Amino acid sequence: MKSLITLLFILIFFSFFACQNDASLVGGKWVESSFRNVQTDTCTVLLSTLLSDSLATSGDTVCQIGHRKDALWGEITASFYAEYEVPSVSFDESIDYLFDSITIRLYSSGDYLGDTLVTQRISMYPLTENIQLDDANYLYSTSNIAYDSQNPLSSFSFTPTPGRRSKELEVRLPDEWGKEWFNLLLEDNRVMESQTFFQNYFKGIAFIPDMNAACVNGFQVNDSSFCITLYYHSLTEVITEKELVFNASTTLTFNKIEYDRNGTPLEDLQSGDDNALSTSLSNHQAYMQGMTGMYISIDFPHLNNLCMEGDLVTIESATLQLYPVKGTYGAMYPLPQTLSLYTANKDNVTQGVITDLTGNSVQTGNLVVDEVTYEKTYYSFDLTSFLQTNLGTTGYNRQKLQLILPDNLFFTTLQ
C-alpha cells in the first residue's frame, strides 16, 4: 500500500443562520425579517502533521519486514522480533525416530510499500536477550532487543505477492538447526521441558531485511504463519510422518520501525504533541502513515469570525471534504475505505471521536472516488455538531480535530 496519504487541500461548506437586530419604523407597512440564511466555503482551515513518540506493536496479527528509500519519504526499515514456544511431545522409547527437515512458514498479509518486482531477502538472527514487555505490558515500534548480527541462523529470498493474503512461503532451514532441536527433544533434555527453560536456551529470532531491498512487505502472524515446523518420521512396520510446530508467541512479538527523513519535506518533523509541522513547511501537504505514527491536526483559527455576521449566529450544517493528492493512490495503492476523526484540545491531546448529529454513530469518512480523472476524490465528514460546539469558544475551551488511519492500519501497516 502507499506509504503516506497526503492531503493537498480541503473544503468546508457552512450553512448558518444570522439574526440581526435592525430597527424598523413604527407603523411600516411590512415587518422585515431579521433572519438570514448564509452559505459559505471560505472558512480558513489549517492542517499540520503530527508524529507520535512510538506505537505499541506487540502481539499484533500483522507485521512488516523490509527496507525502502526514496526522495519523498526518506528511508524506512521494518524488522520483526519473536519469541518461540516449545511444543509438548512424548516419544515411545521402543520406537526409533528419524529427523527429516525443519522449515519456517509465512503467509503474506497482502499489503506492501515499494517495488514488488524486485526479489527481497530476509535474514534470521538469534536473539541474545529475552523479549520482555514493559510495565504497561507492551512493546513498541522503538523497542530494542539485542541479537547476534555476526551469526545468522538462516536467510531466504522471495518475490513479494501484493494483494494476495493466502500466498504461502515455506523456507527450509539448516538441517543442523533442526537436528539439534530434534535430539534435545528425543533426549527429553531440560531445555525442552518448559517454556521457561526453552526461552533461556533459545531466546527468539530477529527477522532483519536486506538494506539493499526496495520494498517493505506485510506478513500475517498467527499459528499458521511464522511457525517453525520440525518434520520427522517413526520407524515402524509402516513409516509414519510426523511434525512438531514451534509457534511464535502471541504476546512476545513486536515490529521495530526505523526511519531517516533527512532531505525530505518531512525532515523537520519531530515527535510530540507540541511539534506540529505546518503544511507551509511541508510542500503545502499534510501526511498520515501507519507504524511511523504520522497523523494530521485540523484547526479552524477564524471560526469565530462567523459571529460577526449578526447578534445571534447558529450553524445549521457544515461538511468537511478532504482531498488526497492526485498520484498518491490508485489501483496498486488503494485509499483506505475509512479514516478516524477525533477531537483534541489546544495541546493536541486526544479527547473523543466525531459522531453524527445523533451522537450515536462514529463517523469514519464517506469516501467518494473519482474513477475518471481522480481529481475529485475526497473523504467527507459532517462537522455540524463539532462546529456548533466550538463556535464562540476561545483559549483552552477551543477544540481541534485529529485525522488518523483506522487502528487496523495505523498500528500494523506502513500505508
Explain the meaning of each model-derived region.
Residues K2-L7, F13-Q415:
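Secreted, disulfide-rich extracellular signaling modules
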